[in-house]
Amino acid sequence: MNNLETVLITISLLTGGTETVNFDVPIHEAVSSSDVQVEYEIAESDINYLAKTLYGEARGIESKMEKAAVCWCILNRVDSDEYDFRNMKTIKDVVTAPNQFMGYDKDNPLVDELVDIAEDVLIRWHMEKDGVVEVGRVLPTEYTYFYGDGERNWFRTDWRSKEFWDWSWDNPYEENLNG
């Protein structure tokens, strides 16, 4: 239950449910990630699913940003209301679904660098869900498809699309993808 629901229920109980209350103040304001110091408990299984998927899908990619984008693509599917992803509500659902992330294998090793990237992205995702803006997301929410060739990854909004993400957002990992 959020704060607004708690306030409304309390007022309703105090007034016998007969009063209407209007709030002109924002209940939840967006804040920048630089203003927030929060620790998140991230499920180890979620980190492992992402890291093992990264091993299969992006281990040959040099760019941390492109590796992180694979994680964001997976999380975009978890959050998506698209028909294609209607039965994918967890990271496990997405990476183990038939014909989706072919690089996931339960026997893939957990490589420290990939575990660190997976955990970093999950922390940023949870911050975003808590209303923090500018968390260092590297892929817009509508990008739910990707393919890679072992050297680069390309992300798109539809599997048939010829238009790909242009890497125009700031890179929290500080490498230059455009030369």
Q: What do the PLM-derived regions correspond to, one by one?
A:
Residues 30-31, 35-179:
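Bacterial extracytoplasmic/cell-wall-associated proteins, especially those involved in peptidoglycan
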Residues 1-47:
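N-terminal export signals and maturation junctions of secreted/periplasmic proteins
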